[in-house]
């Protein structure tokens, strides 16, 4: 599991991105890069690192499911991911 401080930072960053999304869009359309530069760094969605929804793990993240490979495997074995079956050949 990731450190609680990292998970809290991730949620704070998500909130900042949501808060400044409309303003960023307007400033980009105008081409006002000076005002864009004055916005908080963490309001830029490019700086966001995808994290597992369950335990906050940043590595081996599967975008389609929103979880890491470890939690994906557990959820798939429990049958909690619709449409996922174990391969056998």
From Swiss-Prot:
| Assigned GO CC terms | cytoplasm; small ribosomal subunit
The organism's superkingdom is given as Bacteria
Which terms does the record give in the GO molecular function aspect?
rRNA binding; structural constituent of ribosome
Q: Which Pfam families match?
A: Ribosomal_S14 (PF00253)
Q: Which residues cross the membrane?
A: none
Q: What does this protein do?
A: Binds 16S rRNA, required for the assembly of 30S particles and may also be responsible for determining the conformation of the 16S rRNA at the A site.
Family named by the database record: Belongs to the universal ribosomal protein uS14 family.
Q: How does it assemble?
A: Part of the 30S ribosomal subunit. Contacts proteins S3 and S10.
UniProt-recorded name of the protein: Small ribosomal subunit protein uS14A
């Amino acid at each position: 599991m990731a450190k609680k401080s990292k998970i809290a930072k991730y949620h704070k960053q998500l909130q900042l991105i949501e808060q400044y999304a409309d303003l960023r869009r307007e400033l980009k359309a105008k081409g006002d890069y000076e005002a864009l530069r004055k916005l908080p760094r963490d309001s830029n969605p490019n700086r966001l690192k995808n994290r597992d929804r369950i335990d906050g793990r940043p590595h081996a993240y599967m975008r389609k499911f929103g979880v890491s490979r470890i939690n994906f495997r557990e959820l798939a074995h429990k049958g909690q991911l619709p449409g996922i079956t174990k391969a056998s050949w």
